[in-house]
């Protein structure tokens, strides 16, 4: 079992980051890979959850222990797997999630990708009172310089597709941001706010 890994951040993709330590490159699935953009080629520490499956060993990474705790609570709910849990973390700053659980707001929970009514109701039942000791989770890191506007928007769309959002939803988002200049991380944050409305 791993608690965290320290290493050099060598790669960022739409679905995962690669952390090199001890001559090995670890593929780590994270909620918003582009939130690590300002740390590329730097030594970082990332909190880890290790999942062993028959066909694979998977690593899930988090900025903070609280973010990891939210993930572990989410995957304890029947119907929520690691990918859905990462999508929820990416789309929410924890405040909305906690309020929705506390107020049994099933409609809010159903806005997350791949969360239907039954799973949303299960979340309310299983997660009530579980977030009391967890601080606000935010993947908000310092801004990075823009490489290329189209490339940044393209990367953001790829990351949102990886989180389970549908292509037709994302076409509207792409059109909305057409002609703007921002980082992939900021595009993702803005798009997630729009998708959660």
Swiss-Prot record:
Cellular location(s): Cytoplasm
Subunit structure: Homotetramer. Forms an RuvA(8)-RuvB(12)-Holliday junction (HJ) complex. HJ DNA is sandwiched between 2 RuvA tetramers; dsDNA enters through RuvA and exits via RuvB. An RuvB hexamer assembles on each DNA strand where it exits the tetramer. Each RuvB hexamer is contacted by two RuvA subunits (via domain III) on 2 adjacent RuvB subunits; this complex drives branch migration. In the full resolvosome a probable DNA-RuvA(4)-RuvB(12)-RuvC(2) complex forms which resolves the HJ.
Chief location: cytoplasm
Region (Domain I): 1-63
SUPFAM superfamilies (alphabetical): DNA helicase RuvA subunit, C-terminal domain (SSF46929), Nucleic acid-binding proteins (SSF50249), RuvA domain 2-like (SSF47781)
Gene name of the record: ruvA
Keywords, comma-separated and alphabetical: Cytoplasm, DNA damage, DNA recombination, DNA repair, DNA-binding
SMART domains xrefs: HhH1
Primary role: The RuvA-RuvB-RuvC complex processes Holliday junction (HJ) DNA during genetic recombination and DNA repair, while the RuvA-RuvB complex plays an important role in the rescue of blocked DNA replication forks via replication fork reversal (RFR). RuvA specifically binds to HJ cruciform DNA, conferring on it an open structure. The RuvB hexamer acts as an ATP-dependent pump, pulling dsDNA into and through the RuvAB complex. HJ branch migration allows RuvC to scan DNA until it finds its consensus sequence, where it cleaves and resolves the cruciform DNA.
Region (Flexible linker): 143-147
Alphabetical list of CDD domains matching this protein: UBA_RuvA_C (cd14332)
Example of a GO MF term: ATP binding
Pfam family, one: HHH_5
Domain comment (free text): Has three domains with a flexible linker between the domains II and III and assumes an 'L' shape. Domain III is highly mobile and contacts RuvB.
Name used for this protein in its record: Holliday junction branch migration complex subunit RuvA
InterPro entries for the chain: DNA_helicase_Holl-junc_RuvA_I, Hlx-hairpin-Hlx_DNA-bd_motif, NA-bd_OB-fold, RuvA, RuvA_2-like, RuvA_C, RuvA_C_sf
Family: Belongs to the RuvA family.
One GO CC annotation: cytoplasm
Lineage, opening ranks: Bacteria, Bacillati, Bacillota, Bacilli, Lactobacillales
Region named Domain III: 148-197
Annotated source species: Streptococcus mutans serotype c (strain ATCC 700610 / UA159)
UniProt keyword annotation of Zinc present: no
One Gene Ontology biological process: DNA recombination
Region (Domain II): 64-142
């Amino acid at each position: 079992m791993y608690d965290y890994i320290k290493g050099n951040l060598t790669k960022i993709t739409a679905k995962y980051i690669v952390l090199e330590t001890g001559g090995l490159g670890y593929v780590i699935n994270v909620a918003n890979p582009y939130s690590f953009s300002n740390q590329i080629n730097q030594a970082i520490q990332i909190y880890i959850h290790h999942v062993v499956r028959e066909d694979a060993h998977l690593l899930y990474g988090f900025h903070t222990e609280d973010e990891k705790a939210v993930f572990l609570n989410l995957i304890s709910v029947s119907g929520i797997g690691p990918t859905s849990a990462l999508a929820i973390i990416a789309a929410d700053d924890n405040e909305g999630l906690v309020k929705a659980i506390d107020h049994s707001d099933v409609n809010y929970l159903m806005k997350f990708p791949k969360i239907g009514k039954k799973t949303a109701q299960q979340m309310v039942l299983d997660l009530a009172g579980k977030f009391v000791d967890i601080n606000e989770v935010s993947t908000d890191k310092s801004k990075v310089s823009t490489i290329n506007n189209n490339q940044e928007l393209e990367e953001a769309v790829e990351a949102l597709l990886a989180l389970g959002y549908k292509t037709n939803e994302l076409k509207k988002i792409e059109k909305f941001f057409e002609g703007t200049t921002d980082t992939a991380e900021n595009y993702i944050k803005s798009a997630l706010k729009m998708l959660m409305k």
